Design a protein with these regions (language model features):
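Conserved ABC ATPase "signature" region
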Residues: 45, 97-114, 222-223
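Conserved ABC ATPase signature
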Residues: 119-123, 127
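Short catalytic/signature loops enriched in Gly
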Residues: 6, 116, 204-252
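A short, proline-enriched helix->beta-strand linker immediately N-terminal to the Walker B motif
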Residues: 138-142
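ABC ATPase NBD coupling module
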Residues: 33, 46-63, 81, 89, ...
Length: 252
């Protein structure tokens, strides 16, 4: 259940984080199958939605920021064209109102108006990610899914982008699902954490409790991070002989 909060989904590569996000967005392609009795998004069972129902929901009530703008943005269309296209899919606006909405969206993510005339290949990684966020927020969604939005950025830009997402989610009273490998960022910017292993949730906790996690899988994820104190030392690794899906009493 996702309330009006910032929920993080963490786990090693292949644990099912991005696939969970794709299921929520209706983007699991055949032969993939989503198996559940119900899968509710904003009170609607999305497993029963028609293609028309998905078009109304996706990009409007629920939106997604992907990992890399180089692959998510259209390389042969200007930023303004892509933003206006996202608006016309969900709103009927005059040309003037559409232009104003696009300018407001760009300003909200800290970019200057000349960016609108540029193409994705002319943008830096940080600028491209801000454009992706502007696209996702354009129709004021109630839920934002951010799938590794900082993975291609350096440490300084990672913090800037996460702070922008937190600021926008608070201003818009918008729920956010953040998928990330960066546990310190999650601990600093999120409210709650779900930990996934082999396609299953094995742990749940307040984000601030990550450094003191007791579940063996979560604890290893936290301690295997390199830092200044572990320079030159062998980092802990996961004990693959242990069944992490068998959670201890009190863990979920």
């Amino acid at each position: 259940t996702l309330g009006n909060e910032r929920l993080a989904l963490v786990g090693e590569s292949g644990s099912g984080k991005s696939m969970t996000a794709r299921a929520l967005m209706g983007l699991v392609r055949k032969p993939g199958v989503v198996s559940a009795e119900r899968l509710e998004v904003l009170g609607r069972d999305v497993l029963t939605l028609s293609a028309r129902g998905w078009r109304a929901l996706r990009g409007n009530d629920i939106a997604m920021v992907l990992q890399d703008p180089r692959y998510a943005l259209n390389p042969v269309q200007s930023i303004q064209t892509q933003l206006e296209e996202a608006l016309t899919l969900h709103q009927r606006l005059s040309r003037r109102a559409r232009a104003e909405a696009v300018k407001d969206a760009i300003a909200a993510v800290g970019l200057d108006l000349p960016v609108l005339s540029r193409y994705p290949g002319e943008l830096s990684g940080g600028m491209g990610q801000r454009v992706m966020i502007a696209l996702a927020l354009l129709n004021n969604p109630k839920v934002l899914i951010a799938d590794e939005p900082t993975s291609a950025l350096d440490a300084r830009l990672r913090n800037q982008i996460l702070e922008l997402l937190v600021e926008q989610s608070a201003q818009r009273q918008m729920a956010m699902l953040l998928i990330s490998h960066d546990l310190p960022l999650v601990a600093a910017h999120c409210d709650r954490v779900l930990v996934m292993y082999q396609g299953r949730q094995v742990d749940e906790m307040p984000a601030r409790a990550l450094p003191s996690a007791t579940h063996p899988y979560t604890r290893t994820l936290w301690t295997c991070r390199p830092n200044a104190h572990t320079y030159g030392q062998m980092l802990p690794t996961l004990d693959r002989t242990q069944d992490f899906t068998e959670t201890a009493h009190g863990d979920r």
